[in-house]
Swiss-Prot record:
Keywords of the record: Cell inner membrane, Cell membrane, Membrane, Protein transport, Translocation, Transmembrane, Transmembrane helix, Transport
UniProt organism field: Prochlorococcus marinus (strain SARG / CCMP1375 / SS120)
Membrane spanning stretches: 7-27, 322-342, 345-365, 372-392, 420-440, 441-461
Protein name: Protein translocase subunit SecD
GO BP: intracellular protein transmembrane transport; protein targeting; protein transport by the Sec complex
Location(s) in or outside the cell: Cell inner membrane
Short name of one Pfam family: SecD_1st
Length: 494
């Protein structure tokens, strides 16, 4: 009696520990249960006739992983699909455009010096770029319809003047597209005024951001490795005190042009650090910081599909999953009690412990729960019930042979042991195959089912036995009719 109570107390301690884990550790919910965004990214080969190699895809995934981590979206996942696509899931993220801006850019950073005798051309292009930026400000500042009409007329005239200044032919494009065309033309011509350079983003060790002293805009700070610091010092030394500018080019676009003071003529800018200032907002500075920290993409990446799941749909999926799980458990409970009486009640306790242990493991590992994962959990409940059915049927067989209840229980467990082990091992082999060969949701299903297989073995062979022994230690419950109806009992026991 004391021994059975000791094992029962240990089991209750495990149950309490599992319960505390469940209430104190957060659960990770997947996209379909929590809501969020899913982006499909396609990796493009530099040569259209070339196939993308697996190591190239892995390199792209590694860079994107660092960028996603920099975004600070919790529980995000990035996986490959096929030979040239990746699926990014951002649970809880309802504005995928922010992630798209960061992930879709190559982030190839270059530091170049201006070509000789291009000062006047650079100033001309910078004036045009300033006018284009002013047009954007005018459009945003228009508030009432009357002023908007006046501004649109002025803007149309300015756009035509800029097209003439850049030598662009008349266009049938709308005003917005014409402004974009002018902006691209100006940028490409500015970039052409800089010499190629060997100093790139690959020479960086870190990037950060800080607010400028005027408190209205932000700047991005850079730290070079030793080789990069030497290159930067040499580059700035060569143009210090001249009218040649230092251009900072990101993905073929000049984001900043700066002059280098005469005081750096002797050694250049040393210290291995630099600052990019270009009227950044807090958000744009953060995006650039994330891109530079993640590194440049070895191959171009385009976003081919964006899917957003609202939080209400995720809540609805959780509600339906809970209803399905509770309904399944209720039907199992009715079946077990109807067929196995007291043993059925004990099995329900064991199944409740089984469910609690599962959820505690999900929180502890942690496992990201998705709808397929919930399906794997529900299926594993069926396996746990099946193990109890095997045990109780062996117990009933022993009772029909005329054995005592205690002896029948011990013999029933011994005889069912090998069958339970065999069934669980075969299922576990399937889970391992699905987990390593499958992708995405299939892995989630395999993970929860595999965890369920291990816990099912524990609850069937340990928890159920401890509970049966504990309840059978009370004489009032030690009745054969608690397992079999009177017409099922052998004659010597009726």
């Amino acid at each position: 009696m004391a021994r059975q109570q000791g094992w029962f107390a240990l089991l209750i301690a495990l149950v309490i520990s599992a319960f505390l884990l469940c209430i104190n550790l957060p659960f990770q919910l997947g996209l379909d249960l929590r809501g969020g965004s899913q982006l499909t990214l396609e990796v493009q080969a530099l040569n259209p006739n070339e196939q993308i190699k697996s190591e190239q895809l892995e390199a792209v995934q590694s860079v994107l992983d660092r960028r996603v981590n920099g975004l600070g979206v919790a529980e995000s996942s990035l996986r490959t699909i096929g030979t040239n696509q990746l699926i990014l899931e951002l649970p809880g993220e309802q504005e995928p455009s922010k992630a798209a801006r960061v992930l879709g850019k190559t982030a190839l950073l270059e530091f170049r010096k201006q070509k000789i005798n291009t000062k006047s051309e650079m100033q001309r292009l910078q004036r045009i770029r300033s006018q284009v930026n002013n047009i954007d400000l005018y459009k945003k500042a228009s508030k009432d319809n009357k002023s908007e009409l006046i501004e649109n007329k002025k803007i149309g005239e300015q756009v035509n003047d800029l097209r003439v200044a850049l030598g662009l032919a008349n266009s049938s494009l709308n005003e917005h597209d014409q402004i974009d065309q002018i902006r691209q033309k100006v940028n490409s011509e500015i970039v052409e005024l800089f010499e190629p350079s060997s100093l790139t983003g690959s020479d960086l060790v870190s990037a950060g951001r800080r607010q400028e002293q005027n408190l209205t805009s932000w700047e991005v700070t850079l730290a070079f490795n030793q080789d990069g610091g030497e290159k930067f010092a040499s580059l700035t030394k060569s143009i210090a005190g001249s009218d040649r500018l230092l251009g900072i080019i990101l993905d073929g676009e000049s984001i900043s042009e700066a002059s280098v003071g005469e005081q750096f003529k002797v050694a250049g800018i040393t210290g291995g650090s630099a600052t990019i200032s270009g009227n950044f907002t807090a958000e744009s500075a953060r995006e650039l910081e994330v891109q530079l920290r993640g590194g440049s993409l070895p191959l171009p990446v385009s976003i081919v599909q964006v899917r957003t799941i609202g939080p209400t749909l995720g809540v609805d999926n959780i509600r339906r999953s809970l209803i399905a799980a509770l309904l399944g458990l209720s039907l199992v409970a009715i079946f077990m009690v109807s067929f196995y009486r007291l043993a059925g009640f004990i099995a329900i306790f064991a199944l409740s412990f089984y469910a609690l242990f599962n959820i505690a493991i999900y929180a502890l590992i942690p496992v990201t729960l998705t709808l397929p994962g919930v399906a794997g959990f529900v299926l594993s409940i069926g396996m746990a019930v099946d193990a109890n059915v095997l045990i109780f049927e062996r117990v009933k067989d022993e009772l029909r042979r005329g054995n005592t209840l205690i002896r029948s229980i011990e013999t029933g467990f011994s005889q069912a042991f090998s069958s339970i082990i065999d069934g669980h091992i075969t299922t576990l082999i399937s889970c391992i195959s699905l987990f390593y060969l499958g992708t995405g949701f299939v892995k989630g299903f395999a993970a929860t089912l595999g965890i369920g297989v291990f816990i099912s073995l524990f609850t069937a062979l340990s928890c159920t036995r401890v509970l049966l022994r504990f309840f059978m230690s009370y004489k009032s419950l030690r009745k054969t009719t608690n397992f079999l109806s009177e017409n099922q009992l052998p004659k010597q026991l009726t």
